[in-house]
A protein has these predicted regions:
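GST superfamily/GST-like fold recognition
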Residues: 163-167, 192
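Active-site metal-binding loops of divalent metal-dependent hydrolases
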Residues: 9, 163, 213-215
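Beta-strand elements within well-structured catalytic alpha/beta cores of enzymes
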Residues: 2-6, 151-161
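Loop-to-helix element that buttresses phosphate recognition and phosphoryl-transfer chemistry
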Residues: 4, 10-63, 114-128
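Short glycine-rich phosphate-binding loop at a beta-alpha junction
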Residues: 45-52, 140-148, 156-160
């Protein structure tokens, strides 16, 4: 079973100097999404899952059109949930992130004050992933090894989500110990895609990271993070 993970295109995080919660795409982001759709237009997927957040839905729209696919919109795919900073000056939000990064390592697991903890986020993503893959015949083995059972190794699943979500999925599928900055370990630009592929190991299957953040469909001047 191959898993293709798309990160949403560039969102409009700031409008007139103020932060926007659950933002739409920028004009450049919409162009990025169209180019992504052109890149993947001739691919086939057995299942498509899309985050319910606006930036993911708008990124998925041209892709779903060219694929002729019927998606499942999944709220478990949402990004790490931050406090609602709508209307807060963007400089204040930047300062909050700067302070958060300077915290003691153990405090990073708590997330931002008023938002979702990384512990809760990691549990939401991994449990949602396993529950969604099980009907497709893919689920973890019962032992302590990071191996999977796969009924259909040729199945292909497309996910349109977020940097944190996709990085957490990658780490979980690879059996890597989680850290509360997963999105910094696996860097993915806007409207890029990553690919996980299975390989037989003993009596189970292990996944390899075949591609990470492929953005070859975007010229350099259109690549954003």
């Amino acid at each position: 079973m191959e898993l293709v993970l798309v990160r949403h295109a560039e969102p409009e995080w700031v409008r007139e100097g103020l932060s926007v919660d659950n933002p739409p795409l920028t004009d450049r982001g919409r162009d990025q999404a169209r180019r992504l759709a052109d890149r993947l237009a001739h691919e086939h997927f057995d299942a498509v899952m899309v985050s319910t957040m606006q930036r993911a839905c708008q990124t998925a729209a041209p892709l779903l059109e060219v694929l002729g696919a019927e998606p499942r919109f999944e709220n478990w795919l949402e990004e790490l949930r931050m406090p609602d900073w709508t209307g807060t000056p963007s400089e204040e939000v930047d300062e909050l992130f700067t302070r958060a990064r300077a915290r003691p390592i153990e405090d990073h697991w708590d997330g931002m004050a008023g938002g979702e903890s990384f512990r809760a986020f990691h549990e939401r993503i991994t449990k949602g992933l396993e529950a969604s893959l099980a009907p497709l015949g893919t689920f973890p083995t019962d032992d302590d090894t990071p191996l999977w059972e796969i009924d259909d190794e040729d199945a292909r699943v497309l996910v349109v989500a977020h940097a944190g979500t996709n990085a957490t999925i990658i780490g979980h599928m690879l059996g890597i110990q989680p850290l509360p900055w997963e999105w910094e370990r696996f860097v993915m630009f806007h409207a890029s895609f990553s690919v996980l592929r299975p390989m037989r190991i003993g009596q189970g299957w292990s996944f390899n990271l075949f591609k990470l953040g492929d953005a070859e469909h975007l010229p350099d001047q259109m690549r954003t993070r």
